Amino acid sequence: MTFTEQCNQIFNQVIRDYHITNDVDTPINNPYDRESINNRLYLKCWIDTVQWHLEDIIRDPHIDPVEALALKRRIDRSNQDRTDLVEQIDSYFRQKYSEVNILPDARINTESPAWAIDRLSILALKIYHMKEQAERRDASEEHREKCQNKLDVLLEQQVDLSMAIDQLLEDIETGHKYMKVYRQMKMYNDPSTNPILYGKK
């Protein structure tokens, strides 16, 4: 099994598990050992899945403004958790490939493996929900057909992205590419860099 086959299997498992209750407040029940990469992958997709549905809820035109503000702050915290987790996954890869002899002509990639895996997790969610739309009995035939066409593109994208990630990991493992990870350094959640939080008028 390739690494992305492993990822996609776990992501689909998460999405199925979440939709047993389909409730953003459902506690996570991560079945994988806490120290394993599978645990991190499961948690990553769980965060993405909950946030996906929070984003749906906050777009309700009749939402109470107080509830909307609370949701916005919850989404901000979720985004920070997501970023932190991506960096943990990159740390796993840096440790895994720390002994690799990097070739003199090795190149750097535009994004780290974990940020590509982040996109793969979100793509699994898009596929699940687009499939729902393509099969909606209460929607028009035109709607279902349009969504089926989009689903076909998403499935093709999943194949291509999975292959690209596996090739990137192979290139890193063989020294043809090297990892260099830059922390996200988000400013809006930091009381020392957000002017509103540190009191700048």
Predicted segments with their positions:
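Anionic, Ser/Thr-rich low-complexity intrinsically disordered regions
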Residues: M1-K201
